[in-house]
Swiss-Prot record:
Mitochondrial acyltransferase which transfers the acyl group to the N-terminus of glycine. Can conjugate a multitude of substrates to form a variety of N-acylglycines. Catalyzes the conjugation of arylacetic acids with glycine but does not have activity towards any alkyl-CoA. This is Glycine N-phenylacetyltransferase. It holds the Pfam family Gly_acyl_tr_N. The modification N6-succinyllysine is found at K48, K182. It is an enzyme of class 2 (transferase). It comes from Bos taurus (Bovine). GO terms for molecular function: glycine N-acyltransferase activity; N-acyltransferase activity; phenylacetyl-coenzyme A:glycine N-acyltransferase activity. The modification N6-acetyllysine is found at K43, K48, K80, K182. Keywords: Acetylation, Acyltransferase, Mitochondrion, Transferase.
Length: 295
């Protein structure tokens, strides 16, 4: 595959991916941040240029030194042609199947491609599918033709009021990574904690400090520009903190011109209710992640 290098080509890629939203969302969000300084030192590969059919975003080889670190060994894929995608990935060394890795996409149709490739590479695959939400201002800007966008009310959804005497708005610090790691569904280990620290250093974060002066609720961003890892300490749940956090984080990113989206588990009815109240739009085909391990 062809490695796109230099700001001009990456900006052209971003513009082209924008025409394929929402299916290209995970890759579009990643390329957007590659064009804003590329804090995760990622690279973009295409099957051909400029009339590409398949795009793969991945870390530089030197970043992927730990074969068991699937948080770092993460690939984002978008394809206009699934046969082309399978052929491009099968006949190249773009994906290092000897490592523990993750593939992410906002195309559920990639499942067959990933499963077929994994079978030939002797790799075990676990597919996780979640609800993928786009925030209202991002939908108005990037997805104006969606019926749900046309029905959006003016302005932002109102978050639940919080006790602003008790909870103070702040930003996360890398020293808070252990706390985030403890409550992150996909975390709980040393590698995930290092990934969280990197996200805190690289992207805008928000938290509400509780009476003790430590985070009671928080939300972060990952290398694809997605709001992730949000949580509230058990003793402060039920006070509307995560709703407030999402609203504040979203508004701040909107003002910076950053596309805003997030995902939640299909079983997480609380976050789904929050998203509904804040007028988030669920995207077809959802959020997809394939965790791959060599057999």
């Amino acid at each position: 595959m062809f490695h796109l290098q230099g700001p001009q080509l990456l900006q052209m890629l971003e513009k082209s991916l924008r025409k394929s939203l929402p299916e290209s969302l995970k890759v579009y969000g990643t390329v957007f941040h590659m064009n804003q300084g590329n804090p995760f030192n990622l690279k973009a590969l295409v099957d051909k240029w400029p009339d590409f059919k398949t795009v793969v975003i991945r870390p530089q080889e030197q970043e992927m030194a730990d074969d068991f670190d699937h948080y770092t060994n993460t690939y984002q894929i978008y394809s206009k042609d699934l046969n082309n995608c399978q052929e491009s990935l099968a006949t190249s060394d773009v994906i290092n199947w000897k490592q523990h890795l993750q593939i992410q996409s906002s195309q559920s149709s990639l499942n067959e491609v990933v499963q077929n490739l994994a079978a030939t590479k002797f790799v075990k695959v676990e597919h996780t599918q979640c609800i993928l939400y786009v925030m209202p201002e991002t939908a108005r800007k990037l997805l104006p033709s969606l019926p749900e966008t046309k029905n959006l009310p003016v302005g932002y959804g109102a978050p639940k009021a919080i006790n602003q005497e008790m909870f103070k708005l702040s930003s996360m610090d890398p020293t808070h990574a252990a706390l985030v790691n403890k409550f992150w569904h996909f975390g709980g280990n040393e590698r995930s904690q290092r990934f969280i620290e990197r996200c805190i250093r690289a992207f805008p974060t928000f938290c509400l400090l509780g009476p003790e002066g430590t985070p009671a609720s928080w939300s972060l961003m990952d290398q694809t520009g997605e709001i992730r890892m949000g949580a509230t300490l058990p003793e402060y749940r039920g006070h509307g903190l995560i709703s407030h956090m999402l609203a504040v984080h979203t508004r701040a990113l909107d003002q910076l011109g950053i596309p805003v989206y997030n995902h939640t588990d299909k079983a997480n009815k609380i976050v789904q209710k929050v998203s509904h109240n804040l007028h988030h739009i669920a995207i077809p085909h959802g959020w997809n992640q394939w965790n791959c391990e060599p057999l």
